Amino acid sequence: MKPATSELVATLPPELFGSGYPYLDIRNTAYLAALWEEPVTYVVQFAQALDSVTAGYFLSCYIERYRPDEWVSLNEDIVRHETGLGRGRWYKVRDTLLNAGILTNERDIGVSMYRLNGDKLESLLRQHADLSLCAIAAAPVSLNRLHLKTLLHHGLSFKACLLLAVVQADTPHTALADRQAYSPWVPLPEQVVTERTFLSRTEQRRAAEDLRNIGVLETKYDGFPRIRHSRYSLQRLAELSDSYMQSLTV
């Protein structure tokens, strides 16, 4: 039986493997790691509790990786590597969480240490988040980390990445041999997207515009009542992802 990775490795550029020892080169390791990263499960209730989509995303990543009450060393580089958020976004999210009392910050020999206050987070969730059975049981939005980091790398906001993730989640699976340059059109009503992501209608319009400007998303309104439909360009997303991954090997 072939190893599970044999087919994946065969699809990578030959120059990536050099003399046959790809794992000895840190650039190659970064390239492979970008391919195999697990998706992020976005918890919309975190965004509702904090009144911030980006802070909700950061908490989704944080809780997936660290335990409550665990002291964690965080800085710009660590946050960028683990979440894709740049310096400005990280500091804004950090201030939001510190002001809400969810994160505690201490410095230990010049290193910033952070700890999550689980009780405070639970209190905010009970006050501000939709904890109904329907909301809790609804399928969460899953973000492809490679696509997320690709779009952030090319200057888009996390909100644009989140909107694309909703389109991808609603797109029916298509066999690789049958895929076209664009995905099929799928309905994307604004209110439904708000319920699943906490993105306002204005934020959705801006995110869609940013995705259209970079050539990733197309939208149209059909039917009666008129409903927004969207599709994304697999070809353009692949080009942007390749550009981002090439930057990891420079």
What are these regions (language model features)?
Residues 98-108, 212-222:
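A short, conserved structural fragment
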Residues 1-78, 95-102, 111-112, 116-191:
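Short recognition helix of helix-turn-helix/winged-helix DNA-binding domains
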Residues 119-126, 235-243:
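Short, charged/polar, Gly/Pro-enriched secondary-structure boundary elements
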Residues 155, 189-196, 206, 210-219:
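Mid-protein regulatory/catalytic core that forms ligand/cofactor-binding pockets
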Residues 107-113, 221-230:
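Short, Lys/Arg-rich nucleic-acid/phosphate-binding segment
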Residues 76-87, 190-201:
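Short helix-coil junctions and helix-kink-helix linkers
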Residues 85-96, 199-210:
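Short amphipathic alpha-helical interaction segments
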